[in-house]
Amino acid sequence: MTVVHPIAAEKYLSWIDPEDGSIISRRRSPKRGRVRDVAKELYWLSDFIGNPRFSLRLLLVEMEEYRLADGWSKDGKRGSNRYEIFPTALLGDVTLTTPADYADYFLPAALATPDQEGNHPPFTAAVYAKATGVRGRATYGTLHLLEKLGLVEETEEKIGRSRGYRAISRHEHA
């Protein structure tokens, strides 16, 4: 089974005048979609991820969004309504199948690299969030997924008042 999920890698916004339907302005959105942006959706797929018959295909697409300039601000943009959004180009794709694929995108090298003694230092969810840019509840969902895949484990000891995690070497879970 393959699940396909689009990621808006680039987006263009066009503003429509609600009076006559003409395009007022068009600009490129500063927001860029990344593979890690799907972290919050992965929690709901965690029962399937890790199964050799399951793969997740992420499509990096260019999107065009049209919004009505009917908002409450002077230019009508704040609180405006989306009129339509659709993909205009496929910029690339990423297929995640094996635990190593997920490690490449969701487990930063700084946290997965062992120290000089060969031990993986423990880290907290906050350290993981800072290293990856995954925020909020998605942080814990992603760590749960990485645990299920055998890439990280929860440590016995806490770090301050926080749970500790550590990366597992490939030979430890093989």
Language model features with spans:
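Positively charged, polyanion-binding regions of nucleic-acid-associated proteins
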Residues: 97-118
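Short, cationic-aromatic polyanion-contact patches
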Residues: 157-174
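Conserved catalytic cores of phosphodiester-cleaving nucleases, focusing on short active-site segments
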Residues: 1-4
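Short acidic, hydrophobic short linear motifs in intrinsically disordered regions
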Residues: 113-132
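Long, low-complexity, charged/polar intrinsically disordered regions in eukaryotic proteins
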Residues: 25-101
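Switch/connector loops and helix/strand junctions flanking conserved nucleotide-binding motifs
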Residues: 10-15
